[in-house]
Regions:
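Short beta-strand scaffold positions
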Residues: 37, 65, 86, 104-105
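Short, hinge-like loop/turn segments at secondary-structure boundaries
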Residues: 52-56, 81-82, 120-122
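Short, well-structured N-terminal submotif of metal-dependent ribonuclease cores
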Residues: 1-37, 46-59
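Acidic catalytic patch
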Residues: 61-81, 107
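Alpha-helix capping/helix-boundary segments
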Residues: 10-11, 41-42, 70, 90-91, ...
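Acidic, PIN/NYN-like endoribonuclease modules and their adjacent C-terminal/linker elements
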Residues: 96-126
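Conserved beta-strand segments of alpha/beta enzyme cores
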Residues: 34, 62, 120-122
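A general structural signal for well-ordered alpha-helical segments in protein cores
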Residues: 21-22, 42, 51-54, 71-74, ...
Length: 126
């Protein structure tokens, strides 16, 4: 298994206690793969301190900051892919930098952004 980056759809599904998401997350952790979550994805999903399942998922992830360099890459990807979703662009930029796959519920937009990044990562649909 390779590294993975989670998008907002994964966090939302985990917060809703979707069993398949939790099962796949556990398999990754047992294989020694710590999923990466860009901090802007957390911003997009976090609404309340009572989101226990969200915080539980994030405790098994590496939440990475949005660096200035990654922000510039994400901005270029938005232009190249003709996309408007800033958070998806950060997900794609992070995946490209880490040479990671992306777990997403937004296949089409992530695909365009990964293609714009000329990234080799695969998309794993929710």
């Amino acid at each position: 298994m390779t590294s993975v980056v989670y998008d907002a759809g994964v966090l939302i599904a985990a917060d809703r206690d979707t069993r398949s998401v939790w099962a796949e997350h556990r398999v990754r952790l047992e294989a020694g793969i710590v999923p990466v979550v860009p901090a802007p994805v957390v911003v997009q999903v976090s609404r309340s301190p009572t989101q226990v399942q969200l915080r539980r998922l994030l405790s098994g992830c590496d939440v990475v900051s949005l660096t200035e360099q990654r922000a510039h890459v994400a901005g270029r990807l938005l232009g190249r892919a003709d996309s408007r979703d800033v958070v998806d662009a950060v997900v794609a930029a992070t995946a490209a930098e880490l040479r990671a796959d992306v777990v997403t519920g937004d296949h089409a937009d992530i695909r365009r952004l990964l293609d714009a990044a000329e990234a080799s990562g695969q998309i794993i649909d929710l």
